[in-house]
Amino acid sequence: MKKITIAIDGFSSCGKSTMAKDLAKEIGYIYIDSGAMYRAVTLYSIENGIFHGDTIDTDELKRRIGDIHISFRIDPETGRPNTYLNGVNVENKIRTMEVSSKVSPISALGFVREAMVAQQQEMGKAKGIVMDGRDIGTTVFPDAELKIFVTASAEIRAQRRYDELKAKGQETGFEEILENVKQRDHIDQTREVSPLKKADDALLLDNSHLTIAEQKEWLMAEYQKAIKA
């Protein structure tokens, strides 16, 4: 059976990562979480004094970007990949509200995207991968055989994020999360480098009112079509 590249793009908190992880596990592909890579760069910047309040010392980050190496390793207990920053597991650290509130401006920096895209393209050379993010189908893998663009209303996405953080014991107000979601949408869609947009040949999936099972059924059907094409 031929192996393909699957690119899943879309807005923040649409459940892209869960969807991509589950699909990769189901079909035996490698999953690459591009959003986690930008979160890891953000965490590195926070921990290394590159942020001064909300201001990024771009010159310092540019000097250090070559020292930031991100990889994914499967957790033997969960069967899911964890994100490693320079050899250290940072999967939980990169999911905090502090990182969420700072990741969009980091992602908007051209030299950061250039470095991450190079790492992603290296990971994806052998095909048989599922990658999710903002510009996978448009910039990272424009020749991907299956491209999906995921959307849902801002309110539904904020509620999902609220529930996710609450389950982890991180208490944050719904309004703050909704504002963060809307702010990230604006930054992601208007940035100069690789703005968030649907590739012309991507399939649109609005999962506002879909169950996980319905979404999975749709994805598997599209995957089957793509490998037979």
Curated annotation (Swiss-Prot):
SUPFAM superfamilies noted in UniProt: P-loop containing nucleoside triphosphate hydrolases
Key words of the record: ATP-binding, Cytoplasm, Kinase, Nucleotide-binding, Transferase
Principal EC category: transferase
Reaction catalyzed: CMP + ATP = CDP + ADP; dCMP + ATP = dCDP + ADP
Gene Ontology molecular-function annotations: ATP binding; CMP kinase activity; dCMP kinase activity
Cystine crosslinks: none
Domain of life: Bacteria
EC number: 2.7.4.25
BP GO annotations: nucleobase-containing small molecule interconversion; pyrimidine nucleotide metabolic process
Cross-referenced Pfam families: Cytidylate_kin
HAMAP family listed in its UniProt record: Cytidyl_kinase_type1
Homology family: Belongs to the cytidylate kinase family. Type 1 subfamily.
Name of the protein: Cytidylate kinase
